[in-house]
Amino acid sequence: KDRWVRFFYLLSERIYQQAFRVTSLFTDARRIQIELGCAAEKCRVIPNGVQYERFCEIPLKPEDGWVDIGAVVRLAPIKDVKTLLYAFFELSARRERVRLHILGGVDDEDYARECYQLAEQLHLKHLRFPGRVDVAEYLKRLDFTVLTSISEGQPLSVLESMAARRPCVTTEVGCCRELLDGAPK
């Protein structure tokens, strides 16, 4: 592993010297590029975008006595769906009328199977795995969204949730703090 890390740093140094411009998705990624040896004047930030018009008009979910939580994630280890399932287990023990919707495809069949088995072991009766869906359409059913990833850049699911006026709870990865709290000055 150390060999690969050294190779990465060496490669980064050479590429940064040759690069005309280095573009990052968020402020902290730019800072890391500079720490790795890129000249600050070469670095810029161009964040992801979403079609705001597609999400801003989505109505809030009508009050029905249930709290509906959505996670727009692929079933892959990096999305840490197991932690989400354990958290939902804890929440379900404290609150009766809560549902979790895990929206997204399967990237890793073995991991998906482990998630389904864990959900069964935890007896999560108000859990849904609808698979890939039209997120803009499905957001109508959700009160808020959650992201438990262990690594991210600038997650589109958070941007889409915010555009649809849905609160979002995230792990502190990528630029989630920057999205939720605002970019540092």
Located regions from the model:
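Short hydrophobic beta-strand element within catalytic cores of glycosyltransferases
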Residues: 167-170
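A conserved mid-protein helix/loop that constitutes part of the nucleotide-sugar donor-binding site
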Residues: 71, 76-90, 110-113
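Carbohydrate-associated surface elements
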Residues: 28, 49
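A conserved, positively charged/aromatic
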Residues: 1-23
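Nucleotide-activated donor-binding/catalytic signature segment of Leloir-type glycosyltransferases, i.e.
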Residues: 113-132
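Aromatic "clamp/platform" in nucleotide-sugar-dependent glycosyltransferases that forms part
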Residues: 150
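Short acidic/histidine- and often glycine-rich active-site loop of Leloir-type glycosyltransferases
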Residues: 173-185
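Glycosyltransferase donor-sugar binding loop
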Residues: 50, 72, 99-113
